[in-house]
């Protein structure tokens, strides 16, 4: 695994970006690879780093599934306390914290990913940089920003993995946004949500049925995609 520190233009600070290379990358020097970009990079590889206490366990998952196409995995760290702002393109409509407003930095974060991180990866690694071979994955708020970037940069991202979307935080704004977008029908999207979603942070942001809110957000996203073609 390789580690890079890339400067985020709107903060001027460095952000850790880790790259997991496929087996025999150094030997197969003529081969190029598809790329999967993950948000919440601290959650991708090791549970001890995860802010939720458990990770995606990408490395053992790849080892257990040798038939999966070899790929380059890019894990982009979140901004810690700034995560709720960066992973939402709109201000939250839901919040039980008086005087606090979250969200609204998603457009700038998307530009960092697509104009700084992706070009860096394509320049420094043997990637298949085209849309067909570029994917993006995120969960919860990471799922929100995956949805947004996937729509805003449809011409560059061909596959999305959206897990436990938290669009209920800015549902109306997202619905208006997707209604205005012309959707490309060949973009592949995997949507997943469980029936026991939510954590302590969610409970500070919404007083209602949070578990159902996650389910409803995923269903609305699915129906919006169908309606949009």
Language-model regions, residue ranges each:
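Non-catalytic cap/lid and distal C-terminal segments of serine-dependent acyl enzymes
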Residues: 1-229
């Amino acid at each position: 695994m390789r580690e890079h520190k890339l400067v985020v233009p709107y903060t001027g600070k460095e952000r850790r970006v880790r790259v997991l290379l496929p087996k025999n990358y150094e030997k197969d020097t003529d081969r190029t690879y598809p790329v999967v970009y993950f948000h919440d990079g601290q959650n991708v590889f090791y549970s001890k780093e995860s802010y939720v206490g458990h990770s995606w366990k990408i490395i053992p998952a790849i080892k257990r599934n040798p038939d999966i196409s070899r790929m380059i995995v890019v894990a982009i760290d979140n901004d810690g306390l700034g995560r709720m702002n960066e992973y939402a393109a709109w201000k939250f409509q839901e919040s039980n914290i008086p005087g606090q407003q979250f969200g609204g930095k998603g457009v700038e974060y998307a530009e960092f990913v697509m104009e700084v991180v992706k070009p860096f990866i394509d320049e420094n690694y043997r990637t298949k940089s085209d849309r067909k071979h570029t994917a993006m994955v995120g969960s919860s708020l990471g799922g929100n920003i995956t949805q947004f970037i996937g729509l805003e940069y449809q011409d560059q991202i061909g596959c999305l993995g959206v897990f436990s979307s938290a669009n209920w935080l800015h549902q109306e704004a997202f619905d208006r946004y997707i209604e205005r977008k012309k959707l490309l029908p060949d973009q592949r999207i995997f949507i997943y949500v469980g029936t026991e979603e939510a954590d302590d942070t969610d409970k500070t942001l919404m007083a209602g049925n949070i578990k159902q809110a996650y389910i409803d957000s995923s269903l609305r996203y699915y129906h919006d995609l169908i309606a949009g073609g």
